[in-house]
C-alpha cells in the first residue's frame, strides 16, 4: 500500500514537472522504464529538444519587432567597435560629442529661462556678433572633448586657431565643429544645431608641445594637419535641436539617425541607412540676396519657379539654419544652397566644419555636395575658417545647378 502510494505520488509529481517543462521550453519527452525505491518500475523521462521549423522564423521575427527592443547610441557604437568598423578611441570621442549635444539641447530649451538669449557683447573671428549660447555651447563642446582624453586638436567656429587639448598628439583624433549653427535664430526658438567632423592625426603632428602661449613649430604643424580635405573624414554628424533632439551620424557605412528619449536621457536609433531621394521639388535658398547673384544663378532660380512636367513649380522652404534646412533636404530630397554673391565673394559657410561634414553625410546617403563646380570633399582647405559656396542635396538637383553655373 505504501509502495503504491509512493508510486502514485511520484507519477503525479512527474506528470506536473513534465507539463511545466513542456510549457516553458518546448521540449519533447520520451518515457523509459526506471526503478522506484520499492523496486517497482516507473517511467523516467528523457529530454530532447523539439524544433518546430514553422514557428522558429516567426518567433525570430517577433523578437525583432518587439516594441520594447531599442538600440541606444552607446550600444550601437559598441557594436561598431566589436565589428572593427571603429576603434575604442573613436567610440569614446563620439560618446563625448553626444554628451555635449545633450547638454547643449538642455541649454537651448531653457535659454529664455536661464537668460541665455541675446548677444554676448563680443565678436568672433568671423566678425559676427557672438550670442550668449554661442560662447556657452563652445565651452561645453570643448570641455567634453578635452575630458574624453582621446582628442588631440579641436577647431571651432568660435576659436581663432585650433586648440591643443592633450600633452601629446600621437594617436589622438582631430575634431572640427560648429557648436551652435543657426544661433542667430535662437531668440525666436527656431531650429538650431551642432555640426562636427572627425579626422585622424597627420603624421607630421606626433610630438609633445611646450606649455607656452606662443605657437611653436610643432603646434604650427598640428594646425596645418587640421586643414584636410573632407575626403579624409572618418566620421561626421550633426545634432538638431528642434521639436525633437536628433543626432545624425555617419562613420562611412551609411547614415544613421538617433532621437533623444527624454525619459531615459539616451539617444535611440530611429532610422538606419538613410537614403536621400535622387530628385526633389524643394529648394532652400535665401532669395533675399537674389539681386546680388550673378546672371547664371538667377537663371537657375527662375527655372525652378516655372511649372515642370507635373505642372507645378518647385516649393521654397528656407529656415535660415543649415542644420534644419539640410535635415529636411536629407529626408525629402531637393537642394539647399548658399551661393557666393557680391557681398560674400566666397560664400558664407565654412568649408572645414560646416560644408565638408555635411557633404560627407549627404554622399553617404546617396546625395551630392558641390561648390557649383567641384565636389566639396575634394577641396583642400588653406585656412581654418575658409568659406566656400555650397549646393547640397539630391544628385539630380545639384547636377542641375552645376550645369547652369558651368
From Swiss-Prot:
Binding site for substrate: 181-184, 286, 318, 336, 338, 348
Induction remarks: Light activation through pH changes, Mg(2+) levels and also by light-modulated reduction of essential disulfide groups via the ferredoxin-thioredoxin f system.
Pfam family, one: FBPase_C
Residues the record lists as binding Mg(2+) 2: 157, 178, 180
Pathway participation: Carbohydrate biosynthesis; Calvin cycle
Keywords, sorted A to Z: Calvin cycle, Carbohydrate metabolism, Chloroplast, Disulfide bond, Hydrolase, Magnesium, Metal-binding, Plastid, Transit peptide
A GO cellular component annotation in the UniProt record: chloroplast stroma
Subunit: Homotetramer.
Further details from the record: In plants there are two FBPase isozymes: one in the cytosol and the other in the chloroplast.
Annotated protein name in UniProt: Fructose-1,6-bisphosphatase, chloroplastic
Organism field: Oryza sativa subsp. indica (Rice)
The organism's taxonomic lineage, starting at the top: Eukaryota, Viridiplantae, Streptophyta, Embryophyta, Tracheophyta
Amino acid at each position: 500500500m505504501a509502495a503504491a502510494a509512493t508510486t502514485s505520488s511520484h507519477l503525479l509529481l512527474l506528470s506536473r514537472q513534465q507539463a511545466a517543462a513542456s510549457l516553458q521550453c518546448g521540449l519533447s519527452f520520451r518515457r523509459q522504464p526506471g526503478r522506484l525505491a520499492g523496486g517497482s518500475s516507473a517511467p523516467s523521462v528523457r529530454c530532447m529538444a523539439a524544433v518546430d521549423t514553422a514557428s522558429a522564423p516567426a518567433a525570430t521575427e517577433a523578437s525583432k519587432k518587439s516594441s520594447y527592443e531599442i538600440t541606444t547610441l552607446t550600444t550601437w557604437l559598441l557594436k561598431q567597435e566589436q565589428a572593427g568598423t571603429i576603434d575604442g578611441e573613436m567610440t569614446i570621442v563620439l560618446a563625448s560629442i553626444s554628451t555635449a549635444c545633450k547638454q547643449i539641447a538642455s541649454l537651448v530649451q531653457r535659454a529664455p529661462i536661464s537668460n541665455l538669449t541675446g548677444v554676448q557683447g563680443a565678436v568672433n573671428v568671423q566678425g559676427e556678433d557672438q550670442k550668449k549660447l554661442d560662447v556657452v555651447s563652445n565651452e561645453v563642446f570643448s570641455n567634453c572633448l578635452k575630458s574624453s582624453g582621446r582628442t588631440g586638436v579641436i577647431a571651432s567656429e568660435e576659436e581663432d586657431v585650433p586648440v591643443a587639448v592633450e600633452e601629446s598628439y600621437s594617436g589622438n583624433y582631430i575634431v572640427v565643429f560648429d557648436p551652435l549653427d543657426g544661433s542667430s535664430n535662437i531668440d525666436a526658438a527656431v531650429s538650431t544645431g551642432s555640426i562636427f567632423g572627425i579626422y585622424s592625426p597627420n603624421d607630421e603632428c606626433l610630438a609633445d608641445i611646450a606649455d607656452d602661449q606662443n605657437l611653436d613649430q610643432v603646434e604650427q604643424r598640428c594646425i596645418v594637419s587640421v586643414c584636410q580635405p573632407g575626403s579624409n573624414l572618418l566620421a561626421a554628424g550633426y545634432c538638431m535641436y528642434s521639436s525633437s533632439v536628433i543626432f545624425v551620424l555617419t562613420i562611412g557605412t551609411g547614415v544613421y539617425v538617433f532621437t533623444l528619449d527624454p525619459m531615459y536621457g539616451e539617444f535611440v536609433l530611429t532610422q538606419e541607412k538613410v537614403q536621400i531621394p535622387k530628385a526633389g521639388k524643394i529648394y532652400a535658398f535665401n532669395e533675399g540676396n537674389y539681386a546680388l547673384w550673378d546672371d547664371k544663378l538667377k537663371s537657375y532660380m527662375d527655372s525652378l519657379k516655372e511649372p515642370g512636367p507635373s505642372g507645378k513649380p518647385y516649393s521654397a522652404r528656407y529656415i535660415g539654419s543649415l542644420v534644419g534646412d539640410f535635415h529636411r533636404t536629407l529626408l525629402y530630397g531637393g537642394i539647399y544652397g548658399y551661393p557666393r554673391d557680391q557681398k560674400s565673394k566666397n560664400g558664407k559657410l565654412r568649408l572645414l566644419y560646416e560644408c565638408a561634414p555635411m557633404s560627407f553625410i549627404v554622399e553617404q546617403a546617396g546625395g551630392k555636395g558641390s561648390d557649383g563646380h567641384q565636389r566639396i570633399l575634394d577641396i583642400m582647405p588653406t585656412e581654418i575658417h575658409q568659406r566656400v559656396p555650397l549646393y547640397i542635396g539630391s544628385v539630380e538637383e545639384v547636377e542641375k545647378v552645376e550645369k547652369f553655373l558651368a
